[in-house]
């Protein structure tokens, strides 16, 4: 039995960080059509912001300018409804009338392989679990999150991880917290197209976590994406003139790592001066082994 939902009226703004896939291998395809993956997730300090304001009725409302995703398809709304439905299922004798306004400030580009939607969903689950005092553990929230998307659990758990399965089997990993230059070309990559493509490498040898440092960290989706989206290949070439560039997830974002913020910003200024990419989204961010979401959660529970 969980606690009775809270009736607090306080608004709070919670972070939803982006992530990078530092490597991505595919070791096979399952009977259900999904792929078995091995990937390394690390968070970066580039975030969406979600402000949660309790309502006096039971409506769940998303507020965001220039965001054309219908509410019924929005993963934020789906996450909020999922938490409430799960609570009512677990506590059938409880009256739950809590609603919420969710003001989204969208900074993470959509369809860029940075996990923005999954992160927004994870933040919604954790924030409303706190706001509504529904009393679920991180493990329980991660389980709920998996039904929303394979990347949601890593954002719920909040630690850099070596992931397997469809991305839900997570082992904590300690990584150097480098500075990253991230470049997002103006294209939305179809994840479905990538994973259905006949040219996709699906037979990588499985790697054990203890052997991870001995293997080349590559993204097997890169050849498929660059072949079908030349602008992603262009992004890799632009950064590649200064530092080794990789693609995150199924793209379209491309990144490179640096030891210092100054080094990353110097290269960023150089590539921004190139006319053909001056309108592309680009930024420098710090790699993080612990999610800003969990730092914020801890600040609320002290």
Task: Report the location of each language-model feature.
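ATP-binding N-lobe of GHMP and related small-molecule kinases
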Residues: 2-111, 130, 134-140, 166, ...
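Short beta-strands and strand-loop turn motifs
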Residues: 23, 61-63, 105, 214-218, ...
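Glycine/serine-rich anion-binding loops at beta->alpha junctions
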Residues: 103-132, 244-258
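ATP-dependent small-molecule kinase catalytic core of the GHMP/sugar-kinase superfamily
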Residues: 2-15, 21-25, 29-36, 134-244, ...
């Amino acid at each position: 039995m969980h606690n009775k939902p809270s009736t607090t009226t306080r608004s709070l703004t919670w972070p939803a960080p982006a992530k990078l896939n530092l490597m991505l291998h595919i070791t096979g395809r399952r009977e259900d059509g999904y792929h078995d993956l091995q990937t390394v997730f690390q968070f970066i300090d580039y975030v969406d912001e979600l402000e949660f304001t309790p309502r006096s009725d039971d409506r769940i409302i998303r507020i965001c300018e220039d965001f054309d995703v219908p509410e019924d398809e929005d993963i934020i709304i789906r996450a909020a409804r999922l938490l409430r439905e799960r609570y009512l299922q677990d506590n059938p004798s409880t009256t739950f009338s809590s609603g919420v306004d969710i003001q989204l400030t969208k900074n993470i580009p959509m369809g860029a392989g940075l996990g923005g939607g999954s992160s927004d969903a994870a933040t919604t689950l954790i924030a409303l679990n706190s706001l509504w005092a529904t009393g679920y553990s991180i493990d329980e929230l991660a389980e709920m999150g998996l039904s929303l998307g394979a990347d949601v659990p890593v954002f719920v758990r909040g630690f850099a991880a070596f992931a397997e399965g469809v991305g839900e089997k997570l082992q904590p990993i300690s990584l150097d917290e480098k500075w990253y230059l991230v470049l997002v070309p103006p294209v939305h990559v179809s994840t479905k197209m990538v994973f259905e493509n006949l040219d996709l490498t699906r037979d990588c040898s499985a790697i054990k976590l203890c052997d991870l440092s001995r293997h080349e960290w590559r993204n097997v989706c890169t050849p498929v994406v660059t072949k079908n989206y030349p602008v992603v290949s262009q992004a890799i070439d632009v950064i590649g003139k200064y530092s080794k560039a990789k693609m995150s997830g199924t793209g379209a974002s491309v990144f490179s790592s640096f030891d210092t913020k100054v080094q990353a910003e110097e290269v960023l200024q150089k590539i921004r001066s190139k006319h053909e990419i001056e309108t592309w989204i680009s930024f420098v961010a710090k790699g993080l082994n612990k999610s800003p979401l969990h730092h914020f959660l801890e600040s609320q529970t002290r």
